[in-house]
Amino acid sequence: MTTRGFRLDQDNRLNNFAIEPEVYVDSSVQAGWTKYAEKMNGRFAMIGFASLLIMEVVTGHGVIGWLNSL
């Protein structure tokens, strides 16, 4: 007998953990490297490299020289 999300077992005891969610299986196989993650990683790498070049042009020093001057 089911009433608003509760279920009674054969001894008429309340069992509110008896309703289980529907289980599904995703058939697509994906490891940690997805296309979206690779695109984002590439974009951030390009932004970082461009920032490095801009900093070198503006300061006139390379990264190693700039870090040594700190």
Curated annotation (Swiss-Prot):
Membrane topology: Single-pass membrane protein
GO molecular function: chlorophyll binding; pigment binding
Similarity annotation: Belongs to the Hlip family.
Subunit composition and interactions: Forms heterodimers with HliC, these are associated with photosystem II (PSII) assembly intermediates containing CP47 (psbB). Cofractionates in an approximately 100 kDa fraction the thylakoid membrane with HliB (ScpD). Co-migrates with photosystem II (PSII); the same complex includes HliB and 3 FtsH homologs. Even in the absence of PSII, does not associate with photosystem I (PSI). HliA/HliB and Psb34 probably bind to a similar site on CP47; their binding seems to be mutually exclusive.
A Pfam family matched in the record: Chloroa_b-bind
Effect of residue 22 to P: No change in accumulation in the absence of HliC, mutation mimics HliB
Induction comment: Transcription strongly induced in the absence of photosystem I (PSI), probably a monocistronic operon. Mildly increased translation in the absence of PSI (at protein level). Expressed at very low levels during growth under normal light (40 umol photons/m(2)/s), induced under high light (500 umol photons/m(2)/s for 6 hours) with maximal expression by 1 hour and decreasing after, after growth at 4 degrees Celsius for 6 hours, less induced after nitrogen or sulfur deprivation (at protein level). Upon return to normal light protein levels drop rapidly.
Ranges of the Lumenal, thylakoid topological domain: 59-70
Motif Chlorophyll-binding motif: where in chain: 38-43
Record organism: Synechocystis sp. (strain ATCC 27184 / PCC 6803 / Kazusa)
Function of the protein: Involved in photosystem II (PSII) assembly and/or repair under high light stress; probably important during long-term acclimation to stress. HliA-HliC heteromers associate with PSII assembly intermediates containing CP47 (psbB) and bind chlorophyll and carotenoids in a 1:0.6 ratio. They probably protect against photo-oxidation during assembly. The complex binds mostly beta-carotenoid, but minor amounts of echinenone and beta-crytoxanthin are also detected. Accumulation of this protein requires HliC. The complex efficiently quenches chlorophyll fluorescence, contributing to photoprotection. The Hlips might regulate tetrapyrrole biosynthesis, maybe at the level of aminolevulinic acid synthesis and probably stabilize PSII assembly intermediates.
Positions in the Cytoplasmic compartment: 1-30
Biological-process GO terms, alphabetical: energy quenching; photosystem II assembly
Protein name (Swiss-Prot/TrEMBL): High light-inducible protein HliA
Record note on what altering residue 35 to E does: Increased accumulation in the absence of HliC, mutation mimics HliC
Domain of life: Bacteria
Membrane-spanning parts: 31-58
